[in-house]
């Protein structure tokens, strides 16, 4: 189908007369235009309808094949009968039922290609009319072919499931978030409980350690009390003895004072340094010092309880201990050579002063002073200074550049070579007073050598670690020596 084109020819001076036409000709021209537009619309709609029908046929065939595969044998026969009753795509059958309006009122039946009202089609936009016609034709063709509704078909069910899953997704995400929060809370509580259990175990261990210490202290106090009860009657008998015996005992005490005097001084130092924070234990030596003069320390008069306590303590402690006091130098004593001696000087040399009296010069007026202030004189006077200043600036710039270059080179060297920090030199084995952690008041002193306690070694035979018992048991095999052969002459 082709559209007609009208060419208006120029009529010269008869333009006005040619434009004016009769009303009958105008009506005929309008009628022909309406017919042409209607024919064009019907052609376009027919082509659109045929394309839609072909698409629906392809879709229906695919659906039927899926149903045949998925349905039972009883349903497949029914589907085949229904397929036979279908009509060809060329013939279009309009529905016999009347179209109803929005409120149930019947609507005038319209033809498939909307040919009832030609004036309405002329006034409407062709693109809008084509879209509306396509939608209506698609619905009618679906009804004519006899396809099931999209909700009844499996694809429709899948679409409904998708819609439902879209609604469920936010709910599942919320539930997941709640579960994650609950899991995090459970993990935090487990960590908190684990830390609390650790603290409880540490406290239990500290409690057991303190209980063991308290038991040891109680045991020592009981032993000391027993020793005190035994020593009191011996002290009363010493009073009744004659004065000669007391003098001999005093002499013995003076002889043994060399060992006991450092004990008194060290005990006094410990009490002074502790500032009343630590309590002194009631030892037998302290009680004898408070009361009457004690008997001379001999091996026969030592109580068996003290020996047992010594043995128990030596077994518990991994280092050697003694009850005898000994002198230990924490620091080297000041020698007389190192003492700074003051230099005594009899005379101090002082420079001699003399007074020189200078009289001021006479005041002269400015007019009397002859000074040349010409430009040439002024420039000569300041040219040397300017040159010196420029030279200094040049030198300063050069020095700054050299310093920057030196710094860059030094940084490169530091990056390549890592400077190893030298460890401080060990000057003495003795610990410094700043490193003291705690003070222990006890009658047993550790045997210290070079600032560290000596280990408590068990009494056993000397053995070499690389010799086994088997090698010891094997007897030594003496090798036979053959006599030397002498050469015969």
Swiss-Prot record:
The keyword Ribosomal protein does not apply. It is found in: Nucleus; Nucleus, Nucleoplasm; Nucleus speckle. A motif (Bipartite nuclear localization signal) lies at residues 380-394. GO terms for biological process: chromatin remodeling. GO terms for cellular component: MSL complex; nuclear speck; nucleoplasm; nucleus. Residues 347-466 form the PEHE domain. Residues 179-227 form a coiled coil. The keyword Lipoprotein does not apply. Keywords: Chromatin regulator, Coiled coil, Nucleus. It holds the Pfam family MSL1_dimer. Residues 371-389 are annotated as: Interaction with KAT8 HAT domain. Component of histone acetyltransferase complex. Within MSL complex, promotes ubiquitination of histone H2B. PANTHER family: MALE-SPECIFIC LETHAL 1 HOMOLOG (PTHR21656:SF2), MALE-SPECIFIC LETHAL-1 PROTEIN (PTHR21656). Belongs to the msl-1 family. Component of a multisubunit histone acetyltransferase complex (MSL). Interacts (via PEHE domain) with KAT8 (via HAT domain) and MSL3 (via MRG domain); both interactions are direct. This is Male-specific lethal 1-like 1. The gene is msl1l1.
């Amino acid at each position: 189908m082709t559209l007609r084109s009208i060419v208006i020819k120029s009529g010269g001076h008869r333009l006005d007369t040619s434009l004016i036409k009769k009303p009958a000709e105008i009506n005929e021209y309008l009628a022909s235009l309406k017919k042409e537009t209607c024919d064009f619309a019907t052609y376009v709609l027919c082509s659109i309808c045929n394309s839609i029908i072909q698409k629906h046929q392809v879709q229906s065939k695919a659906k039927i094949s899926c149903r045949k595969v998925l349905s039972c044998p009883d349903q497949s026969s029914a589907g085949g009968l229904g397929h036979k009753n279908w009509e060809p795509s060329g013939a279009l059958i309009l529905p016999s039922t009347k179209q109803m309006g929005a409120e149930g009122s019947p609507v005038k039946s319209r033809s498939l290609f909307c040919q009832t009202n030609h004036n309405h089609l002329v006034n409407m936009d062709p693109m809008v009319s084509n879209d509306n016609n396509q939608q209506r034709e698609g619905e009618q063709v679906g009804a004519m072919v006899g396809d099931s509704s999209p909700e009844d078909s499996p694809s429709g069910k899948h679409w409904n499931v998708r819609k439902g899953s879209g609604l469920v997704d936010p709910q599942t995400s919320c539930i997941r978030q709640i579960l994650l929060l609950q899991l995090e809370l459970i993990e935090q509580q487990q960590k908190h409980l684990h830390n609390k259990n650790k603290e409880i175990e540490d406290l239990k261990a500290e409690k057991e350690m303190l209980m063991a210490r308290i038991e040891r202290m109680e045991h020592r106090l009981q032993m000391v009390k027993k020793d005190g009860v035994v020593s009191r009657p011996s002290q009363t008998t010493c009073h009744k003895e004659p004065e000669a015996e007391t003098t001999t005992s005093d002499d013995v005490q003076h002889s043994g004072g060399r060992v006991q005097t450092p004990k008194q001084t060290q005990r006094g130092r410990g009490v002074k340094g502790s500032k009343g924070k630590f309590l002194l234990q009631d030892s037998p030596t302290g009680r004898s010092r408070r009361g009457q003069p004690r008997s001379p320390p001999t091996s026969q008069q030592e109580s068996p309880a003290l020996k047992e306590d010594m043995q128990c303590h030596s077994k518990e402690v991994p280092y050697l201990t003694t009850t005898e006091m000994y002198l230990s130098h924490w620091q080297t004593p000041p020698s007389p050579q190192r003492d700074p001696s003051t230099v005594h000087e009899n005379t101090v040399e002082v420079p001699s002063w003399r007074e020189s009296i200078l009289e001021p010069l006479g005041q002269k007026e400015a007019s009397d002073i002859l000074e040349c202030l010409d430009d040439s004189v002024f420039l000569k006077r300041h040219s040397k200074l300017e040159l010196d200043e420029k030279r200094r600036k040049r030198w300063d710039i050069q020095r700054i550049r050299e310093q920057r270059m030196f710094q860059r080179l030094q940084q490169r060297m530091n990056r390549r070579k890592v400077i190893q920090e030298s460890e401080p030199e060990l000057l003495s084995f003795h610990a410094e007073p700043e490193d003291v952690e705690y003070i222990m008041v006890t009658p047993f002193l550790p045997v210290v050598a070079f600032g560290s306690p000596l280990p408590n070694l068990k009494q056993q035979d000397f053995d070499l670690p690389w010799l086994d018992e088997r090698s010891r048991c094997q007897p030594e095999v003496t090798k036979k020596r053959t006599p030397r052969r002498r050469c015969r002459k």
